[in-house]
Amino acid sequence: QLAEQCEALEQGLLELAQGLLAQVRRHPFTLLPTRLIEQRTSARTTFLRWQHIASRRMGVGVWAEMLRQDKTPEYLLQDLYEMELQRITLNMQISLIHSIGKQAAECAEKMGQAEAEFMGRLQQSQARPGYVGM
């Protein structure tokens, strides 16, 4: 149940991420040499990453480099800063919820295995002749 709740929360966070991506994909941000993209991980979750359009380099360094460039208009700096704060927060929340959900699913599986062993032992005992329950 907790794993399912975490999955739903993660989907909600990914929807928030889509809102941030939509904002970055609008003018005047489309004029910048850096874009915000979704990156799917081997752990089957998605994070937001800054990517330089020409070189395809990724990471916060790409964002910092864009901020330092004189070509980046000053009127965009505050928005870019706030977008980066949102990106950091969303990535942290996605990471935490994904991790908690994974742990909850593994825990539920182990509990199911423990219950199966326990029930198997009880059924084995009850099937014996002369069984007297406690």
Residue locations for each model-derived region?
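Intrinsically disordered, low-complexity regulatory segments enriched in Ser/Thr/Pro
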Residues: 45-92
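Negatively charged, low-complexity tracts enriched in Asp/Glu with abundant Ser/Thr
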Residues: 1-31, 126, 130
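Amphipathic alpha-helical coiled-coil segments
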Residues: 6-16, 76, 80-104, 111
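Intrinsically disordered, low-complexity regions
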Residues: 10, 17, 33-34, 50, ...
